[in-house]
Amino acid sequence: MRIGLFAVGRLKAGPEKDLAARYLDRFAKAGPAVGLELARLVEINESRAANAQTRKREEAAQLEKTLADGSLLLLLDERGKALDSESFATLLGTFRDGGKRDLMIAIGGADGLDPALHARADAVLCLGKMTWPHQLVRILIAEQLYRAVTILAGHPYHRA
């Protein structure tokens, strides 16, 4: 299964971008052994619309343009379901084994994600109940993707 990462906001050069890239590179190298591959990273600028509802709608339209037909959609949202790393790995394995070719993981902007995306999403997860800046969310999900691959492969990286 091809996994894409969609992010509202761009990472500037620096340690956050380097660390996210390091984990995505590890995921890209280890993933094919368990049937997962990094398809692409899509970054968009935050909308400059006057109100939050319009900003979310504009950002959602950009996301919709990137989705392949029949693609699964996983949203990262502070009101989503919290999973431990093993459960996240299991979810990815279930998605992979379900016959869909593409999964897009979406990181929203400062205003969150449009309700229409929530209605269309196959899963809505959180990385804990705290609010995180998108730079850290990018690092956290990149690391969890790599960790999920190691769990699915039985690699000792994950020691729970």
UniProtKB/Swiss-Prot annotation:
GO terms, molecular function: rRNA (pseudouridine-N3-)-methyltransferase activity
Coarse class of the protein's main subcellular location: cytoplasm
Source species, domain of life: Bacteria
Residue numbers binding S-adenosyl-L-methionine: L76, G108, L127, G128, K129, M130, T131, W132
Catalytic activity: pseudouridine(1915) in 23S rRNA + S-adenosyl-L-methionine = N(3)-methylpseudouridine(1915) in 23S rRNA + S-adenosyl-L-homocysteine + H(+)
One Gene Ontology cellular component annotation held by this UniProt entry: cytoplasm
Record's subcellular location: Cytoplasm
Root EC class: transferase
Keyword line: Cytoplasm, Methyltransferase, rRNA processing, S-adenosyl-L-methionine, Transferase
EC assignment: 2.1.1.177
Function, as annotated: Specifically methylates the pseudouridine at position 1915 (m3Psi1915) in 23S rRNA.
Family (UniProt): Belongs to the RNA methyltransferase RlmH family.
Assembly mode: Homodimer.
HAMAP family given in the database record: 23SrRNA_methyltr_H
Protein name: Ribosomal RNA large subunit methyltransferase H
